[in-house]
Amino acid sequence: MKIITDTHLGHTNMLLYEPIRIQKARMEGYEDFDEFLIEWINDYIKKNDEVLHLGDVAFDNAYKLAKKLNGKITLIKGNHDKQKHIDFYKSIGWRIIDGIEIELNEFDKECLEKIKSKYDNKTLSDTACLVKEIGDKRILFSHYPVFNDNSYDEKYQKVTKLLQEIFNLCECDINIHGHTHSYCVGDKRCVNACLEVNDFVPMETN
């Protein structure tokens, strides 16, 4: 499975926040970042590859560019993925995770319901994640990092707390996340899948 996140197609301000984006595009001979990113990613991902996108696909009308991305894509909803965009992604065959999905043979479902009962509906809808075993690792995939030490993200602390409870309930080994771009949180259980820290190459799990 290939993993990408925070493509932010059409998000011109992101080129100011993360100048490495346009620098990388120009280094590869492109002036248009979206054109660069789509072609670059498609060099690594083929049409039949299973792909997990960890959120924040596109801004404004650039969401329609998503149909150019290769792969059989599952999207874990991020904070910038609007409902109009999600409806379009569904129409082009993407699978959408917009809640808590646990793909384990055994876990305490009753305990999960007790955990969920402590949170309001907005927090639950904002906490999209997938837990599954790959090889000998139990992984929680999410848009937000489970153990987030970035003070800028204090507004997401309810989501973070819920993610931590799910991580502990499922006895996960690692968290593969997006959202933080070039910032890497201090907790080594969190693996940043963002393009900026991976030379714009999709991560891969076997």
Predicted regions and their residues:
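Conserved beta-sheet core of the metallophosphoesterase superfamily
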Residues: 91-93, 98-109, 114-206
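Residues at the starts of beta-strands that form the adenosine-phosphate
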Residues: 50, 72, 189
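Active-site metal-binding loops of divalent metal-dependent hydrolases
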Residues: 5-9, 55-59, 79-81, 143-146, ...
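Short catalytic/ligand-binding loop motif for oxyanion handling, primarily in non-cytosolic enzymes
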Residues: 10-13, 60-62, 82-86, 148-150, ...
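A short acidic, amphipathic alpha-helical/loop segment
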Residues: 62-68, 87-88, 155, 165
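N-terminal active-site segment of His-dependent metallophosphoesterases
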Residues: 1-65, 197
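Active-site HxH/HxHxD metal-binding segment of metal-dependent hydrolases
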Residues: 70-90
